[in-house]
Amino acid sequence: MARYIGPKAKLSRREGTDLFLKSARRSLDSKCKLDSKPGQHGRTSGARTSDYGNQLREKQKVKRMYGILERQFRRYFAEADRRKGNTGETLLKLLETRLDNVVYRMGFGSTRAEGRQLVSHKAFTVNGIVVNIASYQVKPGDIVAVREKSKKQVRIVEALSLAEQIGMPSWVAVDSKKMEGTFKSVPDRSEIAADVNESLIVELYSR
C-alpha cells in the first residue's frame, strides 16, 4: 500500500478529529470542518457502524496520525503484544518514541511528516551520530540535535519558534539556542493523544 499524498485536512475530516497532519500555524477550524465528511456535501449518516468498522476506523486513524503503513504498523503491534503491560498503551508509546515523532514533539518540525522528511535528509544527530531513519527508537537520555549545516533552515527555525509559543511536552527538554533536545522519558498514556481508543485496535488484531 502506497503512502497517502492527497489533501491532509481531508483525512482529519474523515476521522472526525485533528490528526495533526497540518502545521499549527493555522487552526484546524480554519482548515476544515471536522463534522463534515469528505465529499461535495459530506456523507450522510447511515446505519450504525459495526464493532469491526469502529475498530478498523481507529486503526486507520492512528496509522494516519503517525504516518505508518499497514505492514509496519503490524510490526509495532506485534512488538507491543510481546512486551509486558497494556498492549494498546505500549503500542502508542512505541509510536511516540520514533525519531520523526520526537523531532516533531521537540518542535523541530511543524508536523510529523515534516519531521520524517527532515530526518531522512540527515538534519539531525542522536547522541552526536547522524541518524536518517525515521523509525529509529529514541531512548530516555538521548540527545537529539539539529546538525550545524541545518540550523539555518527556515522551516526548522519557524517550527521551533511556534513550538516555543505553544509549549512542548514535559517528557522532552529543548535548548532553543543550541537547537537540541533531551528525550527525558517515555511519555505516560495521559501525555499521549487523548482522542485515541487504543483498546479498539487491540480488539481488531485479536479477532
UniProtKB/Swiss-Prot annotation:
It comes from Herminiimonas arsenicoxydans. Residues 31-56 are annotated as: Disordered. Keywords: Ribonucleoprotein, Ribosomal protein, RNA-binding, rRNA-binding. Residues 42-53 have a biased composition (Polar residues). Part of the 30S ribosomal subunit. Contacts protein S5. The interaction surface between S4 and S5 is involved in control of translational fidelity. Residues 97-157 form the S4 RNA-binding domain. GO terms for cellular component: small ribosomal subunit. This is Small ribosomal subunit protein uS4.
